[in-house]
């Protein structure tokens, strides 16, 4: 992989599947871009690459240049809007049937990932986020070893560990934190996803599971707790259909009114799933202010 022009690499890890690792990667990428940084996302989750779907670029065609595979541009930098560029590369682009999980056995998988890591050309990138397969298997260890070998000293900034309130109660997330210690990867912090539910009718956030476990666990391990993220069905609508999130009158996040103004544009063109508009639509999501804070904390952890 040509990493020469990448400033910082951040891994996104989870001890088990389905906790929202790819959603967190996507939202970190959008928030970093909204903060003006140039961002790359590399999806090596062989268990079912979901990143192309999340960015609305499932049908994108990857091309090859002399320097390697060229990542897909979700949007270019727009300095007048303070937005940085966003590019994505996924193993999913190379699978014959998009969205399939890879069924190869260990050594073939590892060889594929190794080659994939070497063959992608990244242009000027402030943050490269890597969405990894869930778990702490041998496959993970070899992925981490490969990365550590390829990155220059200090380039691999660390890992963001994603969990859910239920997963905290299991051993998986602790295993993930132990995995980081074993592989010498610094933990930048823990995100607790799906810690509550944003009601689509009144936008009240209700804690459906016992929340707070992520923070206790982060304290136990002496790592930073980055924050809690509720389930917002409007985020799912944005990802699945490309529709701009809308909220009833009076909806606030941290005291800020995020309700959809009367007469806001919902034209056909606006509704169309189009990766280049995603970042601007995401700005209207109730999760965006939460991720803006998480992202600021990740940046400060990277720079420490
Ligand atoms: N906070 C959230 N609000 C609304 N939907 C969410 C949230 N977090 C995750 N989801 C949705 O839950 C589903 C699973 O999330 P995601 O694919 O990010 O999990 P994952 O941990 O990456 O899974 P896998 O292990 O299969 O890769 C997705 O449809 C995603 O959009
Ligand atoms: S206030 Fe909201 S969450 Fe509670 S019952 Fe009414 S609509 Fe549902």
From Swiss-Prot:
<comment type="function">
    <text>Component of the cytosolic iron-sulfur (Fe/S) protein assembly (CIA) machinery. Required for maturation of extramitochondrial Fe-S proteins. The NBP35-CFD1 heterotetramer forms a Fe-S scaffold complex, mediating the de novo assembly of an Fe-S cluster and its transfer to target apoproteins.</text>
</comment>
<dbReference type="GO" id="GO:0046872">
    <property type="term" value="F:metal ion binding"/>
</dbReference>
<keyword id="KW-0408">Iron</keyword>
<dbReference type="Pfam" id="PF10609">
    <property type="entry name" value="ParA"/>
</dbReference>
<dbReference type="GO" id="GO:0140663">
    <property type="term" value="F:ATP-dependent FeS chaperone activity"/>
</dbReference>
<dbReference type="GO" id="GO:0005829">
    <property type="term" value="C:cytosol"/>
</dbReference>
<dbReference type="InterPro" id="IPR027417">
    <property type="entry name" value="P-loop_NTPase"/>
</dbReference>
<dbReference type="GO" id="GO:0005524">
    <property type="term" value="F:ATP binding"/>
</dbReference>
<dbReference type="InterPro" id="IPR028600">
    <property type="entry name" value="NUBP2/Cfd1_eukaryotes"/>
</dbReference>
<dbReference type="GO" id="GO:0051536">
    <property type="term" value="F:iron-sulfur cluster binding"/>
</dbReference>
<keyword id="KW-0963">Cytoplasm</keyword>
<dbReference type="GO" id="GO:0002098">
    <property type="term" value="P:tRNA wobble uridine modification"/>
</dbReference>
<dbReference type="GO" id="GO:0016887">
    <property type="term" value="F:ATP hydrolysis activity"/>
</dbReference>
<feature type="binding site">
    <location>
        <position position="199"/>
    </location>
    <ligand>
        <name>[4Fe-4S] cluster</name>
    </ligand>
</feature>
<keyword id="KW-0004">4Fe-4S</keyword>
<feature type="binding site">
    <location>
        <position position="202"/>
    </location>
    <ligand>
        <name>[4Fe-4S] cluster</name>
    </ligand>
</feature>
<keyword id="KW-0479">Metal-binding</keyword>
<comment type="similarity">
    <text>Belongs to the Mrp/NBP35 ATP-binding proteins family. NUBP2/CFD1 subfamily.</text>
</comment>
<feature type="region of interest" description="Disordered">
    <location>
        <begin position="249"/>
        <end position="271"/>
    </location>
</feature>
<feature type="binding site">
    <location>
        <begin position="15"/>
        <end position="22"/>
    </location>
    <ligand>
        <name>ATP</name>
    </ligand>
</feature>
<protein>
    <recommendedName>
        <fullName>Cytosolic Fe-S cluster assembly factor cfd1</fullName>
    </recommendedName>
</protein>
<dbReference type="GO" id="GO:0051539">
    <property type="term" value="F:4 iron, 4 sulfur cluster binding"/>
</dbReference>
<comment type="subunit">
    <text>Heterotetramer of 2 NBP35 and 2 CFD1 chains.</text>
</comment>
<keyword id="KW-0411">Iron-sulfur</keyword>
<keyword id="KW-0547">Nucleotide-binding</keyword>
<keyword id="KW-0067">ATP-binding</keyword>
<dbReference type="InterPro" id="IPR019591">
    <property type="entry name" value="Mrp/NBP35_ATP-bd"/>
</dbReference>
<dbReference type="GO" id="GO:1904564">
    <property type="term" value="C:cytosolic [4Fe-4S] assembly scaffold complex"/>
</dbReference>
<dbReference type="InterPro" id="IPR033756">
    <property type="entry name" value="YlxH/NBP35"/>
</dbReference>
<dbReference type="GO" id="GO:0016226">
    <property type="term" value="P:iron-sulfur cluster assembly"/>
</dbReference>
């Amino acid at each position: 992989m040509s990493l020469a022009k990448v400033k910082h690499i951040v891994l996104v890890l989870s001890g088990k599947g389905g906790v929202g690792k790819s959603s967190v990667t996507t939202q970190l990428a959008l928030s970093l871009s909204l903060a003006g940084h140039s961002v790359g996302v590399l999806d090596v989750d062989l268990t079912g690459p979901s990143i192309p779907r999340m960015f609305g670029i499932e049908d994108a065609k990857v091309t090859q240049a002399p320097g390697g595979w060229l990542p897909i541009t979700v949007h270019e930098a727009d300095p007048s809007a303070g937005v940085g560029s966003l590019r994505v590369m996924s193993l999913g682009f190379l699978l014959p049937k998009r969205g399939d999980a890879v069924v190869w056995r260990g050594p073939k998988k590892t060889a594929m990932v190794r080659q994939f890591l070497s063959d992608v050309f990244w242009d000027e990138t402030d943050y490269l986020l890597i969405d990894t397969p869930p778990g702490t298997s041998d496959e993970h260890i070899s992925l981490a070893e490969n990365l550590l070998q390829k990155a220059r000293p200090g380039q691999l900034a660390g890992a963001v560990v994603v969990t859910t309130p239920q997963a905290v109660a299991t051993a998986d997330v602790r295993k993930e934190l132990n995995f980081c210690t074993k592989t010498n990867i610094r933990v930048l912090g823990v995100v607790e996803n799906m810690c509550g539910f944003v009601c689509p009718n009144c936008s009240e956030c209700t804690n459906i599971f016992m929340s707070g476990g992520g923070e206790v666990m982060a304290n136990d391990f002496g790592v930073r707790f980055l924050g809690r993220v509720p389930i917002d069905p409007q985020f799912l609508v944005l990802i699945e259909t490309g529709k701009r999130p809308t909220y009833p009158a009076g909806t606030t996040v941290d005291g800020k009114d995020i309700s959809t103004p009367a007469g806001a544009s919902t034209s056909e063109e606006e509704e169309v799933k189009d990766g280049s508009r995603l970042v601007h639509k995401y700005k209207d999501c109730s999760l965006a202010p939460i991720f803006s804070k998480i992202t600021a904390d990740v940046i400060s952890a990277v720079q420490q």
